[in-house]
């Protein structure tokens, strides 16, 4: 992994007898509870990262009026979190309040000296919203990158060939029954273009309905390690699982490896039961290149935040060993 060292990455050793993919859950999951602050019923689908020797995060808080918004959280160990009671106060470039009607499923990525928050919001339908901060005190809204409808935007943690790179999932305004991952680039985080298809839903049952970006890609010598979500349909609704892929380092619209099996699927009570049952939804990782430890943060049943662990060498080997890449995934994504 090519990233700054994080020696205090949260960690729990692999349990004996683990079967399937080399990912295991934190035994004290979930790490968020109901009614975490006044006026918020649930916190889930949230993104965290190291900050000033400790940890900071942006959290989807479902308010008691049913409207989701983004709240800031602080932690010394990235497991036990204190949430600010007020939602994040976004402003425009002139310092005037500029608040979306709702905001949910945030991601948090640092590029150079700036932290970027990306979320889904209402802009005449489901759309992508963006903001930037350098101190987690002033949050400046950026222009919406795309017209409706789009979700699951994930920013790469560094520029590639001098450009910002963003994954997204074009969709509809509801519970989208389709969806592929696309790549877009920008010179300035305002104007986006050169859209490329990255990968689509597959014939594998667990991701046969739609897929979407998850945690920010992790730079490695093998390529960009991507944890994403895949969705299947059942007689009881959608099931969300976590998948893994490795994208080309210089041209991430090209998929080098894509695991044919899920890495994590709903099994525990906090994943199977909740506001939206049967959901594991990856949003962030904290990773330490020196030890190879990766902590994965994921939403559980639209009700909780869960934590899982893996080792870099083991998960990359598993993805490569179980890889099935379609011809269109290996193309540059333009027709």
Task: Tell me what each language-model feature is.
Residues 1-101, 109-154, 158-209, 218-275, ...:
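Beta-rich carbohydrate-recognition and catalytic domains
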Residues 215:
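Catalytic core of Fe(II)/2-oxoglutarate
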Residues 280:
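Iron-sulfur (Fe-S) cluster-binding modules
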Residues 283, 287:
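C-terminal substrate/ligand-recognition segments
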